[in-house]
């Protein structure tokens, strides 16, 4: 059900609790504020199908602004707070957003944005931005006259070039309380419902945290919103609010497990019924250690921003099939295919495809959309894996060379494109290398131009070069030098050969 129905049935029930302060926002308050947001969007001339963007850190008002967009038929783009102004300018331009709401805590970046877009600030003043709170206060809290369902248009992980906006097909039912398949899965498979107290640990600009928290609201539960993840604070929040569900990435588990034993034992986490994780591969020993600590509540799923398919596995199943990301659930069927689109038998490695009833497209990129389909029309995220005889999926590789560091997806091509413009760089490959805490770290392998001496001074210079234009998460943590990168006569870079040097295995796929 849409949150407005919970506002009518249980108006005083907390929809959101701010973890750090205990401040509670009721369903009645969320409904009223989201109506004001919808009224404001209409007053600014936004109509169904238009896009708007949010550049915010975690704040309870995120939900009112997003639900306001959802109930006014808008496509909302949530932008990472880690991006630089040029990176944000690209997304604003590519998406065609007509309105940007930026947080005052991100003032320095927000003021450097040059894209032509109407601008509102939240949580304080930003030069060139109008404060959104006063504008919201001036709006009626009644629903707009032409309510219809909007949705997220999030920017997907890319392996080459810049990220692309994912346009999912609009709901067949335009009503704002239409059936949301993810909410049904959350209820039927993970047991989320009106009694859920859900710990939200990650930034809401990510697809998963935003999608899961909105599902909790659809199901009538309570979201406990952390401003940012801290391992001991997460344990304290579970105990304080008796959280029984939450969403994590493997890096969170690593940080939790690195807490001293006396700290880990200090908090009661017995209320947890499901700790849902995804976003990056979880090392088997890490997942096993979490199950040993929290019990068989460490549940997993595999999906992408594209929403073309979904697999999931409960902890008890995983203990019988360690390493699996589960079986397909929902409307889409799972297929493993070769490069020609032929379906492969069990235990044979190939590309992972889904066959959803309605599929996505990449905004402004029909070629990329076409590349994601095979001859049957099935779509892939570019991952490689195999299934067993019972349909359980095991991933053996990930999207071509995309780096996942701390659950954040990083596009190597963008970093390579910047580094190769440095006068000392003849050629470059950016890969992910193992990192105990973050899962992977960004490594740049540089072929210097003839006559340039490699070494620490050049590495420092190239690091500074990256920091001028790239966000911190994209700046290489390590820079190595080689005499020559392995390229085919056609110019194709055998990046797999480079990456595998850091992972200690021989290349199988180039």
Regions found by a protein language model. Give the residues of each.
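AMP-binding/adenylate-forming catalytic core of the ANL superfamily
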Residues: 83, 100, 236, 246, ...
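ANL superfamily AMP-binding
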Residues: 13, 28-53, 84-85, 89, ...
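ATP-dependent adenylate-forming carboxylate-activation enzymes
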Residues: 56, 77-90, 104-106, 221-241, ...
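ANL superfamily adenylate-forming
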Residues: 109-154, 162, 169-183, 259-260
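Conserved AMP-binding/adenylate-forming
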Residues: 20-23, 39-86, 409
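Conserved AMP-binding/adenylation subdomain of ANL enzymes
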Residues: 174-197, 201, 205-245, 259
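Gly/Ser/Thr-rich phosphate-binding loop
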Residues: 152-154, 218-219, 243-248, 259-321, ...
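AMP-dependent adenylate-forming
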Residues: 3-26, 124
């Amino acid at each position: 059900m849409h949150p407005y129905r919970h506002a009518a049935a249980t108006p005083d029930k907390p929809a959101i609790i701010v973890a750090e302060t205990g401040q509670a926002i009721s369903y009645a308050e969320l409904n009223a504020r989201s109506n004001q947001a919808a009224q404001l969007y209409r007053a600014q001339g936004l109509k169904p199908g238009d896009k708007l963007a949010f550049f915010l850190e975690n704040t309870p008002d995120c939900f009112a602004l997003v639900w306001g967009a959802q109930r006014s038929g808008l496509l909302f783009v949530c932008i990472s707070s880690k991006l630089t102004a040029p990176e944000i300018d690209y997304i604003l331009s590519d998406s065609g957003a007509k309105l940007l709401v930026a947080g005052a805590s991100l003032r320095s970046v927000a003021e450097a944005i040059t894209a032509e877009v109407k601008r509102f600030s939240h949580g304080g003043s930003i030069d060139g931005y109008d404060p959104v709170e006063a504008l919201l206060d001036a709006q009626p809290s009644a629903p707009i006259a032409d309510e219809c369902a909007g949705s997220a248009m999030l920017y997907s992980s890319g392996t080459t070039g810049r990220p692309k906006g994912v346009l999912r097909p609009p709901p067949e039912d335009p009503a704002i309380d239409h059936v949301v398949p993810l909410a049904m899965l959350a209820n039927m498979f993970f047991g989320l419902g009106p009694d859920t107290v859900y710990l939200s640990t990650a930034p809401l600009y990510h697809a998963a945290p935003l999608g899961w928290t909105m599902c909790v609201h659809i199901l009538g539960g309570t979201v406990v919103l952390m401003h940012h993840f801290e391992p001991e604070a997460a344990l304290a929040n579970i105990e304080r609010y008796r959280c029984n569900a939450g969403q994590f990435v493997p890096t969170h588990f690593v940080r939790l497990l690195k807490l001293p034993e006396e700290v880990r034992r200090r908090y009661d986490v017995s209320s947890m019924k499901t700790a849902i994780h995804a976003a990056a591969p979880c090392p088997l020993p890490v997942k096993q250690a979490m199950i040993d600590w929290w019990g068989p509540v460490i549940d997993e799923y595999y999906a992408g921003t594209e929403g073309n398919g979904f697999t999931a596995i409960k902890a008890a199943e995983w203990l019988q099939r360690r390493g699996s990301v589960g079986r397909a659930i929902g409307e889409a069927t799972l297929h493993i295919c070769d490069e020609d689109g032929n379906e492969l038998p069990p235990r044979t490695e190939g590309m992972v495809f889904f066959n959803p009833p309605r599929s996505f497209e990449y905004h402004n990129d029909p070629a990329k959309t076409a590349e994601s389909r095979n001859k049957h029309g099935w779509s892939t995220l570019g991952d490689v894996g195999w299934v067993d005889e019972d349909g359980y999926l095991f991933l053996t590789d990930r999207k071509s060379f995309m780096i996942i560091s701390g659950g954040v997806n990083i596009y190597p091509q963008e970093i390579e494109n910047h580094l190769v413009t440095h006068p000392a760089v003849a050629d470059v490959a950016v890969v992910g290398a193992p990192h105990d805490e973050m899962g992977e770290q960004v490594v740049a392998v540089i072929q210097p131009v003839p006559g340039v001496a490699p070494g620490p001074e050049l590495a420092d210079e190239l690091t500074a070069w990256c920091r001028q234009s790239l966000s911190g998460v994209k700046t290489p943590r390590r820079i190595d030098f080689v005499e020559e990168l392995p390229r085919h006569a056609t110019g194709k870079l055998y990046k797999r050969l480079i990456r595998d040097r850091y992972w200690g295995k021989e290349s199988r796929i180039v």
